[in-house]
Amino acid sequence: MNIRPLHDRVLVKRQEVELKSAGGIVLTGSAAGKSTRGTVVAVGKGRILDNGETKSLDVKIGDVVIFNEGYGAKTEKIDNEELLILTESDILAIVEE
């Protein structure tokens, strides 16, 4: 199945969270938490401005991003993969390595 986000929405595949602490302790349950880092797999065409023009997004497919999973974030299971639908404003940073 293909999903094409609309407007300023971004489809993100969450990265796996590290299940060991820096000291080597295995984390379980709520201590492990959910990662707020992921890879952009699809982007919308952009945000529609008040004057009707479309401003393209700053993120692109393949970018690794850090995001805030706010109240507007939606989780969808697509082809047995959990993906997040976020607005670009939910993305806090692009990770450059």
UniProtKB/Swiss-Prot annotation:
InterPro entries according to UniProt: Chaperonin_GroES, Chaperonin_GroES_sf, Chaprnonin_Cpn10_CS, GroES-like_sf
Keyword Chaperone: yes
Top-rank taxon: Bacteria
Subcellular compartments: Cytoplasm
SMART domains reported for this sequence: Cpn10 (SM00883)
Gene Ontology biological process terms from the UniProt entry: chaperone cofactor-dependent protein refolding
GO cellular component: cytoplasm
Keywords in alphabetical order: Chaperone, Cytoplasm
Transmembrane segments: none
Molecular function terms from GO: ATP binding; metal ion binding; protein folding chaperone; protein-folding chaperone binding; unfolded protein binding
Function of the molecule: Together with the chaperonin GroEL, plays an essential role in assisting protein folding. The GroEL-GroES system forms a nano-cage that allows encapsulation of the non-native substrate proteins and provides a physical environment optimized to promote and accelerate protein folding. GroES binds to the apical surface of the GroEL ring, thereby capping the opening of the GroEL channel.
Quaternary structure and partners: Heptamer of 7 subunits arranged in a ring. Interacts with the chaperonin GroEL.
Family: Belongs to the GroES chaperonin family.
Record protein name field: Co-chaperonin GroES
Gene (UniProt): groES
